[in-house]
Structure formats: C-alpha cells, structure tokens
C-alpha cells in the first residue's frame, strides 16, 4: 500500500490546488449561513472543489470547507489515488484486527510490507510544534475570534464540527480521538455533544468514577493533517489508536506534542488546539441543530467544555463542515469508507461478496449485503453478524441480504430481489429493544428501538416447499451473433439497415 505523504494539512492543500481540487474564495462571505449556501447544492452536490474562504466577514482567519467533498479527495487524504484502493486500507485493518502468523517463508515474504508498516505506528513526540506558535490563555481566550459557522437558519448557535477531541481514561495507556460537535455558548465555553457509547464519553465516565469531583482534561485539535483526521472516522480496532493508524496511512510516524495545560498529546501540525477541562456535573442544553438526517434534532443536555488555552499556528486556518440531508460531506466520507468496511467484514464472513451503505440511508441506517449462500438460514446469520461484529453498525436499522447475482449498489437489482424472493412473514426478521441512534426521532424511546432484516435470497429446501423460480437468461450464442451484426442493423441511425 504505497501512500502519498502529507506532513500537514497545508501540504495536502498545496497538492489539491495543483490538481484543481481547491478553490480560493477572496470575496467576503459570512460564516453565518452564507458559506453553507455556497457549499451545499452549488458545490458539494456538483462534485466541486474544496473551498478556502480567505476573507470571512468579521474575521481575519480563513475557513476551509468541503475538504472531503468527493470520494477521490477522501482517498487522497488516506494516501491513495482512487477510491478502489481503499480496499487495501480495509485489508490492512482486517489484518491488524486479527493478524495471522505466516504459514511459511513465501507467506512471510508476502507479509513483509504489512509488518514494515507497523514500524510507523508509534507516535513521535516533539518538544515544540507549529500548533503552539501562538498561545492565549485565561481571560484572553475568546472563541468568538474563530469563524465558527452557523449552518442552518434554526441552529441554536455557531457549531464546531471538525474538532478532533483528545481524551484519555484513567485506566488506559492510549488516548482516544473522536469527532464530536461542539456548540458555542460563551467566549470560553462549548457543549461537548458525545453519545454515551463513544470513546470520549466512556473515558469521561471512567474518570468520574475513579476521580470524583476532579476536572476531566480535554483537548480539541482543529485542522490536523488528513491522515489523522480520517483516522478518527475510520473503523480502527479498539486496540489500535487513531494516531497509530494515521501513521500507517501516512507511512511516517504521527508527530504529536504535549499540551500546554495538560498531559494530552495533540497533532503537532494542527492549525488550532483548544485546551481545557470538563467540570463534573456541569451540563447545558445542546441544540437544536440541522443534522445528517435532514431534520433538526431535539434538545438534550451534554457536558460543558471550558477552554483555558488556545494554541495555534501563525495565520491559522479554521477547518469546518456541515451536516444535512445526504449527500453532505459525512455522506461522501461514508461512500469512501464503505470500501474500507468490505475487507473487514469479508475476513470475518468470507461468504460476503459486497457490502453497501447507501448514502441516502444516512450512510449507516440501511445496509445491503450480497453473499454466496451456502445453507438454509444463512441470510439470517449474516444479518446478526452485521449488527454485532462492528460497533459502527450498532445503529443500522435495516439489513437487506441478497444473493451474489444481485448488485448491492443497484436499487433496480435490490428491489427486484426483494419483490421476487421474499415472503414478508417468512423472510422478515424484527428485533426489538436494540440500541438506536439518539438522533433517530422515529424510535419510540430515545436511544432504543427496533431493527429489521430482509432475507431477499433465493430460498433453499427447508425454507420453502415450492418449486423455486429459475432466472431468465439469454442464449449466449444468439447474443454473440447479434453483437456481430448490430452495426449493420443501424437501429439508432437515421439511415436504413443493409
């Protein structure tokens, strides 16, 4: 897996600009709603470039948007030339999740590139770093100087969306990197919206149990290098740190630096770092915000993050995104990361041919799986496997399983299989009282709802007592003959056939 290497976000932007994948906007544009309007239908959905707003109204700091607005740029950020190469990233993760010892000298030789990449997993700690070129603290901290965007008309307040939140639990050696949105509620205060099962929230819960009443250290990095950003959204094994995975992607060790006010380590090349703490028991109502579902979410309480220090580069760039009804930037990330999931699932379930998370299904709420079916009831086993194997699919409400003659990424094929190979009573699996996304207001209880599996495979003996239909297939000899005379027929030409 030969990777393109970027030392920092600016290296990546330079390459994007050279390839026509970055557009600089010099016209003053307001971060309040206007950037989203330029970005949404007019740029992202048209497959347009990353946007660098150099003169956001009221601010001296540029705003970077749409960085991962096409699958190609996601692949480039992971060091690959195109999306298809992301399967190799998935194979590497599958190997790291369940490494297999070499079966012999030849196998050892074949695995040497994977073992060599492991050398890039440890971080490299620096004494000084670009992200600490400027430091403000105490009363000088003012988050209002950062051009934090307001994306939708009914959003409660400006919202940080691409912050890499760094935490460490009291019993863990490695740090956790997670991306959680953060609502601005004061010059030095943000609401940290993390769900209870996410790594940062788990670290906080463990800290509260181990250190009652003590402040929980938190740091947030904005504008890290692309490998570190994407490492935070990729399904890395629980035993692998996001920094280690970023080193694998980049092909060089991730450079980190100790924070000014706590012992957490942040990406040395980040544009901006927010340092501070969460006071146990301090919460605030968060939202509403327009979300990836296409709706405003309900208001709920989350911990308050108090910022004590802001460190940054000279001439820092603020990196932002928005969420809305797909396609949005997270949906584009989902399309690309879909290719990473396939090899991970195939290692556990070799019968899986393809796996697809349609972006219109919010990128995770519906999955289509195609398999080489081997026995009666096989489809139901695969459904249960998808729901339980990776925590990324904990909130997948619908799983459709089809045979390998169906294209999982073609709705015409999938709907044909559902309507011709399913009996609703026999082939529908309903599971009640399962974990559901807090943002899913369709569930009867917040965080708890049902799941549905659809077995759209051909039925085997034991699954049906009827003679099963045989798909219509063309005669290959006739097809070859018509191919040979097709041009002579001139059916789509104005002239007459010969």
UniProtKB/Swiss-Prot annotation:
<dbReference type="InterPro" id="IPR048304">
    <property type="entry name" value="UbiD_Rift_dom"/>
</dbReference>
<dbReference type="GO" id="GO:0005829">
    <property type="term" value="C:cytosol"/>
</dbReference>
<dbReference type="GO" id="GO:0005886">
    <property type="term" value="C:plasma membrane"/>
</dbReference>
<dbReference type="Pfam" id="PF01977">
    <property type="entry name" value="UbiD"/>
</dbReference>
<keyword id="KW-0456">Lyase</keyword>
<comment type="function">
    <text>Catalyzes the decarboxylation of 3-octaprenyl-4-hydroxy benzoate to 2-octaprenylphenol, an intermediate step in ubiquinone biosynthesis.</text>
</comment>
<feature type="binding site">
    <location>
        <position position="176"/>
    </location>
    <ligand>
        <name>Mn(2+)</name>
    </ligand>
</feature>
<comment type="pathway">
    <text>Cofactor biosynthesis; ubiquinone biosynthesis.</text>
</comment>
<dbReference type="GO" id="GO:0006744">
    <property type="term" value="P:ubiquinone biosynthetic process"/>
</dbReference>
<keyword id="KW-0285">Flavoprotein</keyword>
<dbReference type="Pfam" id="PF20696">
    <property type="entry name" value="UbiD_C"/>
</dbReference>
<dbReference type="GO" id="GO:0046872">
    <property type="term" value="F:metal ion binding"/>
</dbReference>
<dbReference type="InterPro" id="IPR002830">
    <property type="entry name" value="UbiD"/>
</dbReference>
<keyword id="KW-1003">Cell membrane</keyword>
<keyword id="KW-0479">Metal-binding</keyword>
<dbReference type="InterPro" id="IPR049383">
    <property type="entry name" value="UbiD-like_N"/>
</dbReference>
<dbReference type="Pfam" id="PF20695">
    <property type="entry name" value="UbiD_N"/>
</dbReference>
<keyword id="KW-0464">Manganese</keyword>
<feature type="binding site">
    <location>
        <begin position="198"/>
        <end position="199"/>
    </location>
    <ligand>
        <name>prenylated FMN</name>
    </ligand>
</feature>
<keyword id="KW-0288">FMN</keyword>
<keyword id="KW-0831">Ubiquinone biosynthesis</keyword>
<feature type="binding site">
    <location>
        <position position="242"/>
    </location>
    <ligand>
        <name>Mn(2+)</name>
    </ligand>
</feature>
<dbReference type="InterPro" id="IPR023677">
    <property type="entry name" value="UbiD_bacteria"/>
</dbReference>
<comment type="similarity">
    <text>Belongs to the UbiD family.</text>
</comment>
<keyword id="KW-0210">Decarboxylase</keyword>
<feature type="binding site">
    <location>
        <begin position="179"/>
        <end position="181"/>
    </location>
    <ligand>
        <name>prenylated FMN</name>
    </ligand>
</feature>
<feature type="binding site">
    <location>
        <begin position="193"/>
        <end position="195"/>
    </location>
    <ligand>
        <name>prenylated FMN</name>
    </ligand>
</feature>
<dbReference type="GO" id="GO:0008694">
    <property type="term" value="F:3-octaprenyl-4-hydroxybenzoate carboxy-lyase activity"/>
</dbReference>
<protein>
    <recommendedName>
        <fullName>3-octaprenyl-4-hydroxybenzoate carboxy-lyase</fullName>
        <ecNumber>4.1.1.98</ecNumber>
    </recommendedName>
</protein>
<feature type="active site" description="Proton donor">
    <location>
        <position position="291"/>
    </location>
</feature>
<comment type="subunit">
    <text>Homohexamer.</text>
</comment>
<keyword id="KW-0472">Membrane</keyword>
<dbReference type="InterPro" id="IPR049381">
    <property type="entry name" value="UbiD-like_C"/>
</dbReference>
